[in-house]
């Protein structure tokens, strides 16, 4: 009997995603990359954090283990278009840049690295900044800087003084 792995036959794929991702990582460890990709890419999800996670993981497997940057771009684009927080936007843009760089699409890669580097307070934003501006220091804009009075009051708190030791 063959089990159909489509959204019409899956019950609550959002609840199953965590288990699927754990199994996929185990398959990667066992070097069963194609099976891991099938498990993550046929997730049956259409929205939400599980959808974003599934699309990113599918793109990562496609790029890192299947050596298929075109397939990865498809997944990273879906990821990028369905997230909203800076940490996720920078992550999606970075991986789109990396996929395009591998394809030799330097202009497209730089476009995505620049997009990711707009979020300098994130890991991928910093990686992207280093890719396109290797000798230029990080400069945070005024919206990212902490108000001096707020910082001063924060460091006056007893618990902060204890932890700061």
Functional labels for PLM-detected ranges:
Residues 1-165:
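Extracytoplasmic and endomembrane cell-envelope/extracellular-matrix remodeling and assembly machinery
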